[in-house]
């Protein structure tokens, strides 16, 4: 009887064949963050969804309507993307933010008289009475969003779930997906997928990425986060995390009865045809850091080490800087260069121009920075700054021979920078390292999507679990 049920489930997965000769699946992905949202999770979901579609699967994405300030982009080919508004106050905030953003752009155009700032420096246009008024309104919106976040678990993004749930029910009745993927972070995608799965009986895959309960979870939501994490781990047909350390943490927290765990790390996009070689400066050591800064990633030991190392420069690209780092960039513009926020293709181009790419580990956490694995596709060595002995990402540097490792301390970084300067002067900077996309093909998003497809197929056969 069990064998007959398994055959029935496999038969229900569909008769269309994928590019690899397997039966195609109908997959619904629930993700609050999706292209053009610039968040790291948006990049992950967009790449994995595109990879599933490229394999021949029928993939629909249920996501939030584009927020204010997001650059309009075409949806990735092969995907059906359904965007729903959060409604209510969140929708009003979106509209107000768009209006303020448009007014800011007009002010900037007037201030710079039609010129554009260099992509390597931050714009320093002086504020006017008009921009001050816009800043006050922007702060008021930020305060309102913070106020609303404090009253919804775990933040205001969960207000998107209501409208998305109604659209998801309609989509399921018309299209009948065989598996649902819930994306985290934020929690909204996970909550939506879980609700749709319970209502429909369709199994869901918890694409956790990182734990729901983390070191930065607000105290008021810690108990609720742990309970949601527990329920999802027992209710989902499969769980996906980004590191072995996170998988071990889930088993330790929630016991051996949880759903099957798979580790699918972050990755990088395949580039075809291969990009041309970059001609780099013969003098000095050019360091590049792309990405965000968080309270658990301290950039100041790196900054102090660079300032103490003649011949080194550091270019930073990201959505913003911590105050102390912003001050240092303003005081040392020839050494510390802030490129501002770049789109993904611009960030990749900047990475390829570097002598060495810098990544800072997450202190006290099991997560591996996604940027570290993205760097593997750039063809450049990585300087990884290890925050503590338990950091799981540090092992990647030694195992993959992709760069250099130092404690996130000024003395250790300074000593390594001195060594790297010498290696470059001697023409040995890349010596002994594995570099380039071909060396790390297992981290390409298209390969990772194949692994996610296998997880989805197993989940569809296993069926829905009960929490």
Language model: regions and residue ranges:
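N-terminal subdomain of nucleotide-sugar transferases
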Residues: 2-4, 9-90, 96, 238, ...
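Membrane-proximal helix-turn-helix segments that form the acceptor-binding/catalytic region
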Residues: 47-48, 166, 188-191, 195-198, ...
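Conserved donor-binding/catalytic core segment of Leloir-type glycosyltransferases
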Residues: 279-297, 303-306, 452
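Acidic donor-binding loop of glycosyltransferase active sites
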Residues: 237, 351-367, 380-383
């Amino acid at each position: 009887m069990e064998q007959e049920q398994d055959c029935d489930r496999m038969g229900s997965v569909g008769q269309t064949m994928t590019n690899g000769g397997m039966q195609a699946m109908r997959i619904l992905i629930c993700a609050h963050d999706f292209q053009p949202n610039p968040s790291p999770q948006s990049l992950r979901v967009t790449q994995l969804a595109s990879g599933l579609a490229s394999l021949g699967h029928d993939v629909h994405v249920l996501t939030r309507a584009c927020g204010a300030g997001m650059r309009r982009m075409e949806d990735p080919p092969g995907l059906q993307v359904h965007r729903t508004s959060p409604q209510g106050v969140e929708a009003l905030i979106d509209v107000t933010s768009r209006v303020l953003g448009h007014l800011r752009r007009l002010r900037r155009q007037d201030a710079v008289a039609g010129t554009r700032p260099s992509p390597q420096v931050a714009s320093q246009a002086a504020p006017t009475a008009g921009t001050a008024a816009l800043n006050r309104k922007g702060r008021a919106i930020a305060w309102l969003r913070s106020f609303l976040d404090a009253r919804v678990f775990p933040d205001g993004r969960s207000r998107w779930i209501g409208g998305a749930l109604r659209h998801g029910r309609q989509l399921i009745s018309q299209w009948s997906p065989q598996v649902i993927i819930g994306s985290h972070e934020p929690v909204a995608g996970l909550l939506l997928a879980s609700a749709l799965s319970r209502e429909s009986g369709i199994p869901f895959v918890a694409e956790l990425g990182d734990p729901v309960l983390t070191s930065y979870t607000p105290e008021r939501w810690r108990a609720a986060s742990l309970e949601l994490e527990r329920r999802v781990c027992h209710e989902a047909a499969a769980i996906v995390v980004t590191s072995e350390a996170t998988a071990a943490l889930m088993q330790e927290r929630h016991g051996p009865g949880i759903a099957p765990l798979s580790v699918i790390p972050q990755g990088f996009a395949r580039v075809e045809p291969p990009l041309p070689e970059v001609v780099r400066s013969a003098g000095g050591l050019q360091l590049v850091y792309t990405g965000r800064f968080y309270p658990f990633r301290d950039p100041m030991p790196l900054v102090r080490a660079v300032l103490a190392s003649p011949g080194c420069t550091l270019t930073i690209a990201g959505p913003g800087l911590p105050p102390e780092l912003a001050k240092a960039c303003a005081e040392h513009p020839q050494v510390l260069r802030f490129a501002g926020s770049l789109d993904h293709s611009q960030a990749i181009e900047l990475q390829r121009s570097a002598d060495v790419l810098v990544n800072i580990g997450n202190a006290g956490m099991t997560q591996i920075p996604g940027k570290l694995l993205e760097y593997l596709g750039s063809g450049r060595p990585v300087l990884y700054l290890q925050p503590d002995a338990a950091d799981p990402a540090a092992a990647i540097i030694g195992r993959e021979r992709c760069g250099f490792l130092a404690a996130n301390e000024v003395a250790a970084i300074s000593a390594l920078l001195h060594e790297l300067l010498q290696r470059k002067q001697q023409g040995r900077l890349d010596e002994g390292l594995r570099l380039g996309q071909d060396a790390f093909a297992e981290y390409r998003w298209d390969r990772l999507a194949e692994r996610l497809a296998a997880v989805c197929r197993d989940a569809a056969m296993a069926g829905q679990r009960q929490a």
